[in-house]
Structure formats: C-alpha cells, structure tokens
Design a protein with these regions (language model features):
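Conserved SAM-binding motif I beta-strand of class I
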Residues: 3-8
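A short SAM/SAH-binding and catalytic strip from SAM-dependent methyltransferases
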Residues: 48-69
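Class I S-adenosyl-L-methionine
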Residues: 103-155
Length: 155
C-alpha cells in the first residue's frame, strides 16, 4: 500500500484534504502543515519515494524565482529526502514556471528528465496518476488553459 502525505502551509487546504480523507475513509493519507522550506525536518534522508508538485505558486514577480518549488535550492532539499531513483512530478498551467523548471533541470547536474509535455491532455496520458485532477487543475481546464507536466529524477 502506498501512503500519501499532503504538505501545505495553508490550513484551509490541509483541512479540505483531511476532511475528504475522512469521508472517503482513506487510511493511507496524512497531512502536514508546514513551510516547504522545512521539509527536511519531517523526513529522514532517502525516506520519500515520490514527490508531486501540483499547481504551485509560480512566483512570477521579479526576484522571486528562488521561491519557486522547482528552483535549484528546492531540488537540493528534495534530493536529500528522496530515495535513490525517486521520482518528482510537476504539473502546472503556467508556461513561465514550466519553462523555468525545464531550464533549471537542464542546468542541474543530478537531474534526469524522464518525460515532459507542454499539453498533457492533447494525447493519451503517460501515467495513470495524471488522471486525478486537483481543484486548481479543473479550474484552469475550464478556462481553456493547457496543463504542462514534467517527470524527473535527481540522481
């Protein structure tokens, strides 16, 4: 059985996820309300199998790129807690964040891009887990936005 841990600083999102897990009687879901900058305090080295980054704040203002969850400083954090060969996934509607992520990964020596797509719904989904949409994903799709996806590993 896979376990899932939702991490967010916003209490309302944690509450909604926890309420859904209770209603659906999910015994493999847990939630952690914390700043992502502190993620290493909650997981031991090589404890995590996969990380999903779904529709994060793209931090588009000048000087905020280092706060993007796909910036090199976050990749360093993820690399510490991921198991060898662990996967990372990014889903976004934002082209700036998507392109920034690709550029960051190409420049990050330990990164290996396994799959990238600037419009995942224009062809059959490469990963069954992609069929589960977040609230924000559904909202962006209703507005006609394309959803971008990157799957990668940090060796």
């Amino acid at each position: 059985q896979q376990n899932f841990i939702g991490v967010d600083i916003k209490g309302a999102r944690i509450w909604k996820g926890a309420k859904t897990a209770l209603v659906q009687q999910l015994d493999n879901a847990a939630f952690l309300r914390t700043r992502i900058e502190q993620i290493e305090l909650f997981f031991t080295p090589e404890e995590v199998d996969e990380i999903w980054i779904t529709f994060p704040d793209p931090f588009l203002k000048k000087g905020k790129a280092n706060r993007r969850l796909s910036s090199a400083n976050f990749l360093d954090r993820y690399r510490k807690i991921l198991k060898k060969g662990g996967l990372l996934h990014l889903k976004t509607d934002d082209p700036t964040l998507y392109n920034f992520t690709l550029e960051t990964l190409w420049a990050y020596p330990q990164a290996e891009i396994l799959y990238m797509d600037s419009d995942i719904y224009s062809r059959p989904l490469p990963n069954p887990a992609l069929q589960f949409n977040t609230y924000y994903e559904d909202m962006h799709l209703r507005k006609g936005k394309t959803i971008k996806y990157v799957q990668f590993r940090l060796n």
